[in-house]
UniProtKB/Swiss-Prot annotation:
Pathway: Porphyrin-containing compound metabolism; heme A biosynthesis; heme A from heme O: step 1/1. It is a multi-pass membrane protein. It catalyses: Fe(II)-heme o + 2 A + H2O = Fe(II)-heme a + 2 AH2. Its cofactor is heme b. The chain crosses the membrane at residues 23-43, 85-105, 109-129, 137-157, 172-192, 212-232, 278-298, 308-328, 329-349. This is Heme A synthase. Interacts with CtaB. One of its GO terms (cellular component) is plasma membrane. It comes from the Bacteria.
Length: 359
């Protein structure tokens, strides 16, 4: 007689539930990796000026690239009709077009894959009754977020097809922030499935979680500001550090050159880069304070180690940002900078989630 035959029914049910939870957690962490890759591939698409190479949105038929010489030429002719071609790539041949096309096509294909990798396992776990309590609506919300991101991506691309030679930087920022929020949501859901005993009293955990939440908010703002920098190509200007145009704090008249005033925060290259620099210092300072606060409150426990790890990632990201700036945004540096932004974000979410559970 096996151990399973003699085990109490309640114990068997508990084991089945634990296995289901582990499977759901593995699925969610896998989705987080896919979204991470999606953001990095999106960065490569932007840095190679590939984002406008596909001028139509075909959610189903667009999953396949052109399969004949005639189809490739037709796609190329479509691209030649938009302003970017004449302004940036008037000498591009078909081989060059195929290069940028495959970046954008791969980005969209990965988006479709993420949609399938979300919907099918969700349906499977739902029908098998293996979703943890309270997760059904949350996961439906995640699926809706993915669909919304597809629409926002096309809305962003449309902004560069008629009167501009690039996508609107504010739409790029919305696209990246929505991807970042989706990533945050997945990491939070996955991390929440790891149950451990409470180690921190509710009063101490609440205060520390408030600080961690402020850090997370600052990181999200910084990611949005980074998208504005990328959309304006502001990283290719003012390529000195720590001074910008010979000053740590640029003249107010230079920062407020455009009218109305709000336009400077999204259209003024100097202002956009300056605010990205300043918020980087803010994130670094808040993270350093979190380390002192956590270690002073809890000693050298698990939460302090997480805070130190987050500080290390933030410091590495600041150094990468400086290198990206002074080297005038080489592809490798731009991609590493974007990848590290998501690593910082994921660590910040995991830290906040653990504190919310008293760990």
């Amino acid at each position: 007689m096996s151990a399973l035959d003699t085990a109490p029914a309640g114990s068997l049910a508990e084991t089945h539930a634990q296995r289901g939870t582990r499977a759901v957690a593995f699925w969610l962490w896998s989705l987080a990796v896919l979204v991470f890759l999606m953001v990095v591939l999106g960065g490569a698409t932007r840095l190679t000026e590939s984002g406008l190479s596909i001028t139509e949105w075909k959610p189903i038929s667009g999953a396949l690239p052109p399969l004949s010489a005639e189809a490739w030429q037709a796609e190329f002719e479509n691209y030649k009709r938009i302003p970017q071609y004449a302004a940036l790539f008037p000498d591009m041949d078909l081989a060059g077009f195929k290069f940028i096309f495959f970046f954008e096509w791969s980005h969209r294909l990965l988006g479709r894959l993420i949609g399938v990798a979300t919907a099918l396992p969700l349906l499977f776990f739902w029908l098998r009754g293996r979703l943890p309590e309270g997760y059904r609506l949350k996961l439906l919300g995640l699926l809706a977020l993915g669909g919304l991101q597809g629409f926002v991506g096309w809305w962003m691309v449309k902004s560069g097809l008629s009167d501009r030679v690039e996508v609107a930087q504010e739409r790029l920022a919305i696209h990246l922030i929505l991807a970042s929020l989706t990533f945050c949501f997945i990491v939070w859901l996955a991390a929440s499935l790891r149950k451990r005993p409470r180690e921190i009293s509710p009063s101490k955990a609440s205060g520390l979680a408030w600080g961690a939440g402020l850090i997370l908010l600052a990181i999200l703002v910084q990611i949005g500001l980074g998208a504005l920098v990328a959309g304006l190509r502001a990283g290719r200007a003012y390529n000195t550090w720590p001074l910008i145009e010979g000053n740590f704090l640029p003249p107010v008249e230079s920062l407020t050159l455009l009218t109305p005033l709000w336009r400077n925060f999204v259209d003024n290259l100097l202002t956009v880069q300056f605010q990205h620099r300043m918020v980087a210092y803010l994130v670094l300072g808040l993270t350093l304070l979190q380390v002192f606060w956590t270690s002073g409150t809890l000693g050298s426990g698990r939460a302090t180690k997480r805070a130190i790890a987050l500080l290390g990632l933030v410091l590495a990201q600041v150094i990468l940002g400086i290198l990206t700036l002074v080297l005038v945004v080489p592809l490798w540096a731009g991609l590493l900078h974007q990848a590290f932004a998501m690593l910082v974000l994921g660590m910040a979410v995991a830290h906040l989630q653990a504190l919310s559970q008293g760990r």
